[in-house]
Each structure stands twice: as C-alpha cells, then as structure tokens.
C-alpha cells in the first residue's frame, strides 16, 4: 500500500450496531489521524455464530453511520461471499488493498478481541496490511491512551429485544426503528 489517506476499518457482526460502535468510530476519527472510518459488517461470522441477514445488518450500519461525518459502510465481504475465507480479516484486508491500492488501512479492535488474535486466521498478515488501533473495553486490562468503551453488547441487546425490553440509548434511534419495522430479534 502506498501513502494515500488512512482509512480505519471497524469490523464486526453489527448484529445490531450499537452506540459503542459509533463511539469507537468517533474516537478513531478524533484521535488516530485517520481520514475515515468504514463500518465493515462480516458476511458470515468467522466462528459460526448465527446472524441476522447480511442485507439487514448492512442497512443498519448505513443508518448508524449517518450519525457521524466521516463514517461510512463497506460491504466488501459480500463481494467475497463465494470465497471460502470470507469473514477472515486477513482475506478481507487483502481484497480491500487490491481494490484500493492508494489507500492505507488501519483496523480498530477492542481489547477483548485483541486477546483472541491467536485464534485468527493469519494474524501476522493482518498486522502487515493494517495498523492496529486498540480501544479499551470494560472488564479488560486498560489500553494506554484509549478510553474504555461502555459495556454494551449486541448479544445483550438482542436478548432484551427478544424479551420486549427497551433498548433506547443503546442502539441508534434509526437502527431501532429499522429493527422494529423488520421484526428483527423478536423472541
């Protein structure tokens, strides 16, 4: 990769996207010298978890991204749907580097995820293709210079939605409306 702008990728299942995702994106834009943050929903979860349909998660990311200037959505993993390595960060980064040769990439990961990189496919390749930006997570060792994100979990949000509980304040309002209109995560 050459000079160009640096784009930070915030990958995840976004099942659904929540305000801590937006906080991480804003923090990266404000403090890490990146020109943009791309929300990058996984097409298929690398560890086999069930997800809402990709198209719904992509649209929820678009709705969430509208809240912050400089945050966009990248559906690159859909382009790799037939690839047996879809969902593997190294493969996605290789794809993006080939598609955008004038861009530099960074990868935003939570401290909780950083502890699991031994399970990742070709973590060494991920580090070669992208600068790693670590955000703190409550309940994990502090990350120097990074705030701890609130302990908001998509899993807990889905459970609350399934029980008919209120999740306002945890999920962007437009995302919540979409979830309700589509009947996602009902019990």
From Swiss-Prot:
It catalyses: nicotinate beta-D-ribonucleotide + ATP + H(+) = deamido-NAD(+) + diphosphate. One of its GO terms (biological process) is NAD biosynthetic process. Its EC number is 2.7.7.18. InterPro entries: Cyt_trans-like (IPR004821), NadD/NMNAT (IPR005248), Rossmann-like_a/b/a_fold (IPR014729). One of its GO terms (molecular function) is nicotinate-nucleotide adenylyltransferase activity. Catalyzes the reversible adenylation of nicotinate mononucleotide (NaMN) to nicotinic acid adenine dinucleotide (NaAD). This is Probable nicotinate-nucleotide adenylyltransferase.
